[in-house]
Amino acid sequence: MKKLIALLLVLGGLLALVACGFPVQYKDGGDGGKDETPVVQPDNGYTLGSTDVVQLNGFRSIDIEWISGSVTVELYDGEGIELKEALADGGAVSVPMEWRVDEDDSTLDVCSQPKLLSVSEEKHLTVKLPRSMVLHELDVETVSAAVSVDLTDEDTLTLNELDITSVSGTVYVNAANAGEISLSTTSGAISGSVRTQNLEADSVSGSVELTLDVLPTELDMETSSGPVTLTLPAGDTAPSLFVEFRTTSGQFASDVPVTHMKDAPWELQTVSGSVTIALAQ
């Protein structure tokens, strides 16, 4: 369970960043009063607030760090990248997000708020990517924010790596077409459909329920108590899988023939969580 331990350490670091920020300062309302609008300054090199289009030429990756609320990534007909944020309750955002273009790393960095603020708001972030975009990596890290990545429209986006990590937020992916996909959570559920040759999913107590549009060449899944359900694509003949399944008290069930062997291309490890491999109807 080394990967699960590493996951907990990473997620603990995210929580520490939230807890260790500076107290937020507020504007002087005059006449001894206090304006409840916080004074927010961006980190060095960052810009505050939503932006209609970020023009990116030859960009390598997008890194998103979000605390609470939700993150939605989808495709659209534009030529740049749209970043929009809004409060969950529809109110005005008082602690805006910040973003920057890192020319050295060819990366777009997006944060839910300046890193040294201790206050946070439950906000929805919508990221729209051009359908024709070529991107090496999309990396999303959240604390309690739910993550939804929907790349269904014509599957024209070229993406090499998709990496999503959350503490308690749910993770949903739809037709995520990438060379490598990694999905990690502590207590949030992981669900959706994926198309990849290399799939990794890690959970402690959250469930994992994924439909595989194609059979990955390599698959690695670890859970503690969360159940795992993998639905394979339907075909004229059922595939025969080579699987290494390690567990303490978990159960394994499969609708297709499985050969259990050490160091198999598909590795499934649980403590008490069940694993089910089903065939799409």
Predicted features and spans:
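Repetitive beta-strand solenoid architecture
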Residues: G58, I67, D77, E121-K123, ...
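Repetitive helical segments and hydrophobic/amphipathic motifs
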Residues: L11-G12
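Short linear S-[DN]-x-LW-Φ motif typified by the pepsin-like aspartic protease active-site region
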Residues: F22-D105, H124-H136, A146-E161, P265-E267, ...
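Secondary-structure transition/turn motif
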Residues: L87-D89, V110-K123
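Positively charged n-region of N-terminal signal peptides that target proteins for export
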Residues: M1-L8
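Polar/charged low-complexity regions in secreted precursors and cytosolic/nuclear IDRs
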Residues: D63-E65, L117, D139-E141, A145, ...
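Short, surface-exposed interaction patches in beta-rich subdomains
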Residues: N174-A176, E180-I181, A189-Q281
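C-terminal motif of bacterial Sec signal peptides marking the signal peptidase cleavage site
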Residues: A16-A19
